[in-house]
Amino acid sequence: LGVSSVFAQKQPVDYVNPLMGTDSKISLSNGNTYPAIALPWGMNFWMPQTGKMGDGWAYTYAPDKIRGFKQTHQPSPWINDYGQFSIMPMTKQLKIDQDSRASWFSHKAEKATPYYYSVYLSEYNMTTEIAPTERCAYFRFTFPEASDAYVVVDAFDRGSYVKVIPEENKIVGYTT
């Protein structure tokens, strides 16, 4: 009985809301943060991407569409990123362009903690979940049954390269 009550107690990390400070605008600096899904001192961070590629703010609270889930090294929106790429799961029809593949989402169906992120993508009737590790992240995509499913890997920048090798269940590449 005593052991189970220890696990039910909240830990300090449970009080962290990664969405705080994400209502960023050029006209008024309101935090300029992004909801990092990462371990302390992790090699990279992951975040949902609501902004267009190349924008300083990859995630801001106001938009209602997610364009992908971005791997980032960006410490602040005021400092440019490097080695970045985004992945976007989808169903129905493969869409490569970042505007056409974006999916509507609601903050009511979004859960953000430093150690777990989940969101329902209504355009594709599916859920994406992310859990960080020291060097990467685990993703779980819950696709609807009897639907074609895709995952787009977008390396963003010129000079980047992505190759899918289906027979080896492998994706290789690099970004600049």
Name the predicted role of every residue range.
Residues 9-176:
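Accessory carbohydrate-recognition regions in carbohydrate-active enzymes
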Residues 1-10:
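Bacterial Sec-dependent N-terminal signal peptides
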